[in-house]
Amino acid sequence: MRLRLIANPNASGVTRPLVDAVARRLSEVAEVELRLTDGARHAIALAGEPGADVVVAMGGDGTVNEVVNGLPPGAAMAVVPAGATSVFARQLGLSRRTLPAAALVAQAIRSGSQRMVGLGLANDRLFTFSAGMGLEAEATRVVDEERYTRFDGRRPGDLKVVAAAMRTLRNDGFALPERMTIELEGRSIRCGYLAVANQHPYTYFGRLPVRTAPRAGFETALDAVVVGELRSRDLWRL
């Protein structure tokens, strides 16, 4: 069994000793090739290189997304969470702690345990658990810019994301006009915010789950959350 461990050294909480500890744990069940990312989209290229039976993403949800989009046909994927939120890993039932999660991954590889996970596609890019348009997309864009200008490449905390969303709402007078038109089940709908969920909960705010699409699941079709008008007070009700 050949395993490629792709680790993001800029993920929150990631240190080289932790990466080495995960590599040692996985080497108990497979031949491990360790690769470190050095920037955005690098994990896509690393995941796509031939020669691995299993590709393990170690980092946050951004690293997971890149590995998913680079994964070659026939290769399996595993996740070792090491980011600030690690939504996908938590939705899979993995521990939030990196080393216990690595132990579960090693156990699954040893036993040959696998799980099929349905994916979504937006703008020719796969996503694992959610895709947001409108407010969420703009807040994420702002946070990603600040990540490299103010936070040395590490993802800001959840409060920074909320602050970015509030600034976006403030710029629109604390209301999002219906700027988008979507086609959903044969109907044309105008909306100010759209979220597509592949699993429940949609995301987490620290330890608290954000419950927007409680019927979503990896084994079912995608769920859409459509909001016609959104004000700042509604953020806490989502």
How should each PLM-predicted stretch be described?
Residues 20-24, 51, 72, 144-145, ...:
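Short, solvent-exposed amphipathic alpha-helical segments in soluble enzyme
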Residues 63-74:
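Short Gly/Thr/Asp-enriched flexible loops that form oxyanion-binding sites at enzyme active sites
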